[in-house]
A protein has these predicted regions:
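A short glycine-rich, Lys/Arg-flanked "PGG" loop and its adjoining helix->strand segment in the class I
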Residues: 163-175
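A short SAM/SAH-binding and catalytic strip from SAM-dependent methyltransferases
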Residues: 146-160
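Class I SAM-dependent methyltransferase SAM/SAH-binding core
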Residues: 75-79, 85-134
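Conserved beta-strand signature within the Rossmann-like core of class I S-adenosyl-L-methionine
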Residues: 176-183
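A short acidic, Gly/Pro-enriched loop at the edge of an enzyme's catalytic core
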Residues: 137-148
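C-terminal alpha-helical "lid/dimerization" subdomain adjacent to the S-adenosyl-L-methionine
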Residues: 184-246
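Conserved class I S-adenosyl-L-methionine
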Residues: 7-71, 85-86
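Core SAM-dependent methyltransferase catalytic element
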Residues: 251-271
């Protein structure tokens, strides 16, 4: 009988980051997330296994600027909102704020609508748009936001589009506003890639066992490496992306949290 937590199988011993890069040569792009099965599987299975997920949300809240004075309306934009967990966290913190949940996946927007139904219907707008195209901004209900956040979305864009999007985000920020990106970034070394994959899969296995399900490390690692959405990733190092933000005029740019390939980085618009 195999030990579900064992990492000593033939596959486990032979797996390395080079294998991962070979498997994930671009074959799909962000549109794979329009597949309802892919979106649902991430939210139901992998989202909860993200390393340091709760800490990422805590750091995000710490990075928020003070609320606008004189009871001015507060607006938050969640780009690639997924199931809406980032926006929900901020709206609970900033009571009475207005939110915009934007995603290109119909399934994700449905999940976000369900999660965010706890807020008044007029408080949250739901928008289906492709952030690969600059016209995504045309669908926004307002053109100035106190906070713009994104979680595990922008890494699906090619680098040139990432940089252009960061410029578009900067233009949409109110003076003193913040852009916070909770993101999957590229490891500097193949060793880092391998450590990330193993740590993530150990969390997946642990969660399955806690639910009374079978969780075999080698099987889950194989599934994780060969998952359909893996080849949609266009990972870029956090150092490179911080430099882009600085060049665009963001201030107090930094990586405020990082664990393997997961990072929380942010920048502000000068008052």
């Amino acid at each position: 009988m195999r030990d579900p937590n064992s990492e000593t199988s033939n596959f486990g011993n032979s797996f390395n980051a080079e294998d991962r890069r070979t498997i994930t040569e671009p074959q799909t792009d962000w549109r794979v997330w329009q597949d309802g099965a892919v979106a649902t599987q991430f939210v139901k299975e992998r989202r909860g296994a993200i390393l340091g997920g709760a800490t990422q949300l805590e750091v995000m809240l710490e990075l928020l600027p003070p609320r606008p004075p004189n009871l001015a309306p507060t607006w938050v934009l969640d780009l690639g909102c997924g199931d809406g967990v980032l926006l929900e966290t901020i709206l609970r913190h900033w009571t009475g704020a207005n939110g915009v949940a934007l995603d290109g996946s119909p399934t994700m927007l449905e999940l976000a609508l369900e999660r965010l139904s706890i807020f008044h219907p007029s408080a949250v707008s739901f928008i289906s748009e492709d952030i690969n195209l600059p016209k995504w901004k045309d669908a926004l209900p307002v053109l100035q936001f106190d906070a713009i956040v994104s979680g595990f979305c922008i890494h699906h864009l090619e680098d040139e589009r990432k940089k252009a999007l960061y410029a578009e985000i900067y233009d949409l920020l109110a003076p003193g506003g913040v852009f916070i990106n909770i993101e999957h970034v590229a490891s500097v070394t193949p060793h880092g890639e391998e450590l990330f994959s193993r740590a993530y899969v150990r969390n997946i296995v642990r969660r399955k066992i806690e639910r009374g399900e079978e969780g075999i490390f080698e099987d889950e690692l194989t599934h994780f490496v060969n998952r359909l959405d893996a080849s949609a990733n266009r990972l870029t190092s956090v150092e490179t992306q911080l430099q882009w933000l600085c060049t665009l005029g963001y201030t107090d740019v930094d990586c405020y949290w990082k664990h393997y390939e997961l990072a929380v980085f942010a920048g502000y618009k000068k008052n």
